[in-house]
């Protein structure tokens, strides 16, 4: 079972990591007041980066609450997001959304991200089976 922690190796830490996701995202999921960008990372676990600027969410209390909620939602859903580098970009108005609504919204966004993700492993394994037959 995958651990549900949010340790250092599950975070995007350097500007280079963020730039890689911004420059060539393989998945893009727009949501209400936010945008999720994702890119394959070649690892067995996902990594998360958050971009919540003062322009989009004025109060530090709200920015911290949003970061806490985003990290928690990511932590609880990380087993279905394995192998992705994910950046969440907050937009204006996100700070006014209530916690239960945000949790529900993120649940839907993670599922949309997984559905939009290409699955080459399934196609490759099907090709291998057909050659052996």
From Swiss-Prot:
Which GO cellular component terms, listed alphabetically, does the Swiss-Prot or TrEMBL entry include?
Answer: ribonuclease P complex
InterPro entries recorded: Ribosomal_Su5_D2-typ_SF, Ribsml_uS5_D2-typ_fold_subgr, RNase_P, RNase_P_CS
Tell me which EC number(s) this protein carries: 3.1.26.5
Q: Which reaction does it catalyse?
A: Endonucleolytic cleavage of RNA, removing 5'-extranucleotides from tRNA precursor
Provide the alphabetized UniProt keywords: Endonuclease, Hydrolase, Nuclease, RNA-binding, tRNA processing
Annotated NCBIfam families: rnpA
Q: What does this protein do?
A: RNaseP catalyzes the removal of the 5'-leader sequence from pre-tRNA to produce the mature 5'-terminus. It can also cleave other RNA substrates such as 4.5S RNA. The protein component plays an auxiliary but essential role in vivo by binding to the 5'-leader sequence and broadening the substrate specificity of the ribozyme.
Subunit structure and binding partners: Consists of a catalytic RNA component (M1 or rnpB) and a protein subunit.
| Family, as annotated | Belongs to the RnpA family.
Protein name (record): Ribonuclease P protein component
Q: Which organism is it from?
A: Pseudomonas entomophila (strain L48)
The protein's gene is named rnpA
